[in-house]
């Protein structure tokens, strides 16, 4: 897969450089407000509002990254002069269906949410698709001087 390969190559170049470096990995970022480039949360919201949301996978896991927390993480990394490779997402693991279900409930959308299967989708597509992209954030949590918001808290802060 092109994206994954180029990302891995870029990380390798950075890690083999002779300067101090920091890499922050994230997964499925979202904001609590709208932005030009649609994010994970707003893609689901828009799909529900327009009655065009595809069935959501119950067998694919991801770890959403709340942008407000990521900004604080970046600030912490700079202040503490942290170097190395860190996972900087929420540390939570959600299926696409669970994520959409919580959005549906939180915003009282009453959308008829359908379950989908990544395994079934992959039978009809040549596109590579990781079954689990959630990240373990134990390493960075040791250095943070603040508590990350839970994804549920972050979604509740979202402005429609």
Where are the predicted features?
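Glycine-rich Rossmann NAD(P)(H)-binding loop
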Residues: 31, 55-61, 86-94, 143
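Mid/C-terminal beta-alpha module of Rossmann-like enzyme folds, strongest
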Residues: 73, 80-126
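NAD(P)-dependent short-chain dehydrogenase/reductase
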Residues: 12-62, 69
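Short glycine/proline-enriched coil/turn segments at helix->beta-strand junctions
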Residues: 17-20, 50, 79-83, 109, ...
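Conserved C-terminal active-site "lid" loop/helix of NAD(P)H-dependent oxidoreductases
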Residues: 95-101, 118-158
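Hydrophobic/aromatic beta-strand patches that form the interior of the parallel beta-sheet core
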Residues: 22-24, 86, 149
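Hydrophobic "lid"/C-terminal helical patch
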Residues: 44, 74-78, 100-103, 155-159
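Active-site helix of classical SDR
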Residues: 6
């Amino acid at each position: 897969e092109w994206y994954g390969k180029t990302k891995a190559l870029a990380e390798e170049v950075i890690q083999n450089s002779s300067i101090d470096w920091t890499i922050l990995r994230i997964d499925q970022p979202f904001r609590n407000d709208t932005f030009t480039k649609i994010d994970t949360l707003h893609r689901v919201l828009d799909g529900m509002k327009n009655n065009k949301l595809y069935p959501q996978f119950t067998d694919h896991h991801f770890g959403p990254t709340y942008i407000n927390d990521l900004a604080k993480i970046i600030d912490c990394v700079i202040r503490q002069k942290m170097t190395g490779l860190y996972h900087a997402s929420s540390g939570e693991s959600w299926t696409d269906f669970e994520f959409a279900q919580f959005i549906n409930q939180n915003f009282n959308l009453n959308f008829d949410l359908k379950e989908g299967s990544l395994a079934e989708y992959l039978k009809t597509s040549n596109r590579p698709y990781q079954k689990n992209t959630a990240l373990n954030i134990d390493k960075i949590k040791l250095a943070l001087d603040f508590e990350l918001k839970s994804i549920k808290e972050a979604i509740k802060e979202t402005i429609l």
